[in-house]
């Protein structure tokens, strides 16, 4: 189990992952806060749940809770570099669902409600799931602690 966790948190990605992970993590967290808490002009769980139900994602409230939690908590974890690979994988899955359930029928461009923004977030989170946190991450502290015990 220790070897699995060490492999999960280890990364040689350097500074590039940090440059991706912090702004994308904070952006995801802000979007999650819109869904969960109605912050930043969002609709909260009730409004987001109704929207998700209208897309056929039922039960809407639960889907809003799952998507909002993945974005908010996953985004914070990405920004900190805490369990980066699992947080990025969950975020990538969330973006894939968003692309195919809410945006694909609107085409590529965001100005028409398209999927370009979710696609960029998907690409970045897949990249982070592969590379790991990089430098200046809580994952590195965990990896060092596991290798010294």
Each predicted region: which residue ranges?
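Extended, low-polarity transmembrane helix blocks
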Residues: 1-39, 61-69, 73-149
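Membrane-interface interhelical connector segments
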Residues: 38-59
């Amino acid at each position: 189990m220790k070897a699995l966790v060490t492999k999960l948190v280890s990364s040689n990605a350097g500074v590039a992952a940090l440059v991706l992970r912090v702004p994308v993590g904070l952006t995801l967290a802000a979007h999650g806060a819109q869904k969960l808490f109605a912050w930043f002009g969002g609709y909260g769980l009730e409004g987001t749940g109704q929207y998700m139900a209208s897309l056929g994602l039922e039960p809407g409230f639960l889907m809003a809770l799952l998507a909002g939690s993945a974005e908010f908590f996953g985004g914070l974890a990405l920004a900190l570099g805490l369990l980066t690979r699992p947080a990025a994988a969950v975020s990538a899955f969330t973006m894939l669902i968003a692309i195919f359930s809410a945006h694909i029928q609107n085409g590529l461009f965001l100005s028409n409600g398209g999927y370009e923004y979710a696609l960029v977030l998907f690409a970045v989170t897949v990249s982070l799931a592969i590379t790991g946190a990089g430098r200046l991450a809580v994952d590195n502290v965990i990896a060092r602690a596991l290798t010294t015990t």
